[in-house]
Amino acid sequence: EKFKDRALGEYFHPAQGMATSNNERFVRFWWEVDQSKLSLHIEDQLKWKQYSKGGPFNKWYGNNWTVVNWANNGYEIKNFVDESGKQRSAVRNEQFYLNEGVTYTASGSKGASFRLHPANNLFDVGGSCLFSKSDYKNNSYLLAFLNTKLAFYILDCLNPTVNTTQGDLARIPFVIPVKSKEGIVSRLSNHNVRLKKAICAFRIFETNYSNSPLVIFQGSTLKDKVLDYLKFENTCLTQVLLN
């Protein structure tokens, strides 16, 4: 009753992801699959789509290391039944598949953490997402708002447990900002995403991994290379906090 004004759920739909019911069969780490069948674009119709699946506490960007078998528009998953013919898998909110949004880790002692959910990704029940359902479609501002201490405090008041539900997110009070403030916040949010992407580019388990920091950083010794990388990562993370 305290939240009488408009809520987040009026502008964005908190969507629960799919449950394959057999991840050993349908889900892989991206480095385990034939790279020629790894989808990089919506139009390519390749077998393995990137799969937002939650993961450890991590803000802005990352935890992109799993892929799911979506060959023939997910035919195998959609027709996965038990011996009696009863449906085992649950393909939920398919209308939002492959759209950009905001994904989050819903369970953890540190609370929820929110990250960019790139277009061309699918999402798991453990990596549920928020998608625009109105004329307001600024995912950058939404991401910044949800990663604030204010949003964290409100979620903790609504549900003081280690699990954040779709209903909790929908109830958060939300006001569309004035354009000038929205632009500033969105730019800082996008900057944070770029900084986290730069860090992920040196993490071998992330899909945007490019090269080892031991190759890129030009220290004269192994110790110097490691120290240069740690300085780079610390600088990026410090800027994220300042933003």
Where are the language model's segments positioned?
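Hydrophobic/aromatic-rich, well-ordered segments within soluble, folded domains that form packed cores
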Residues: 49-51
